[in-house]
Amino acid sequence: MVKTGISLDSVKNNNKSQILKILQKNGAMSRKDIANQIGLTPAAVTMLCNDMMEAHMILEKGEMKEQKRAGRKKVLVDINYDFKYIVSVNIEAVDTSITVTNIRGNVLVEAKVHTRTDIEPQLFLEELAKEIKLQLWEKELKLSDILGIGICVPGIVDRNNGISIHAYGIWDNQVKIREILEKQIQCPVILENNVKAFAEAEMLYGVGKYGNNIVFIKWGPGVGSAIVVDNKLYEGNQHNAAEIGHYIIEPDGLKCRCGRHGCLETRVSMFALCDRIKEIYSKENTPVLYEETAGDKNLITRELLTSWVENEGNGYITRMDQTISEILVGAIERMARVAVNVLTILAPDCTIVFGSMFENTSIYKLFIQYCTKYDENYTDKLISRSHLRDKMAYIGGTALIASTYLSLIHISEP
């Protein structure tokens, strides 16, 4: 006889997940207020909360402060954000960051290693696994304390199978990241594109949880984007969606690291900007930079450009050569033009921008000015900087695991 219908355990898990999500969005609440929101009886919610308290998933936070009233005071419950911990790994072209956080995203451990592209991906990932285990050991954390490992990489990702299909600027071929790391660490791994992971973090921890349709744009070191439709990340054909950095702006233009020609990234990424600056670099064209770098164009690197952008108000950027200023302004205009075209088609509720280039207030303001020039509706009210941008190195990886946990979806054991 074939059993049909929904199991009682499934219903209970679904209700527990609803409770966790409400607490994540609203903070500590009373059992009665939770019951009113999810449509269950206070008695049913009390039973569910008792189960979760026994499992250390939630905890009581004391009595609610309210006006004097007869009867028992409401007792608040909240998520136990220190119930377990999460390892977040962000693999970029130059460096890879390793961060251990609690479920809320508060940091316990931070470390950084060089992203080695001079060796086979498997060897680098094995080295990475050793570093992760070292960081856990130094913090006296056991694998049983870890909910999972969230991995973020640029480029095209097959999340379901844990495969990096093409990590632009890092690996040209497919890399089975989840399989390799789970074998080394014996801990569940979730892999996602870095911009999509950040979008997931915004929906969990940031202003994204208040909007239904959102576009995310990242600038620095490359260009990336993600789309949220009806509170869900949009996944396109072949795991490839919303690649604004590979919007073609110049037919027969420069070859991009994605393999095509004329992509936006070939003109506005930090690598492209460095190449363009090197082309015009001379004592006559760039006298200030020439002096800063002692006549050595090899010192013009992505790291140098990043330091200019991040140290706004200090150093070279305050007295930049006019020729280099024109290159940066041209890049900002291109970014704004493509962004307006994309937003005109998608018409989102809001747009959230982040990345090292948008960290610079002058660059962000000029970007908004160009957007408004092309369409007066695209002001800083519609296009805003992420409040999570200072957590960009780890919050995406944390969100991958935390959102799965809050949904009470079982993370497959390796």
Give the role of each language-model region.
Residues 89, 147-152, 156-275, 402-408, ...:
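Phosphate-binding/catalytic loop of phosphoryl-transfer enzymes
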Residues 1-61, 67-71, 76-137, 141-144, ...:
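ATP-binding/phosphotransfer module of carbohydrate and carboxylate kinases, centering on a glycine-rich
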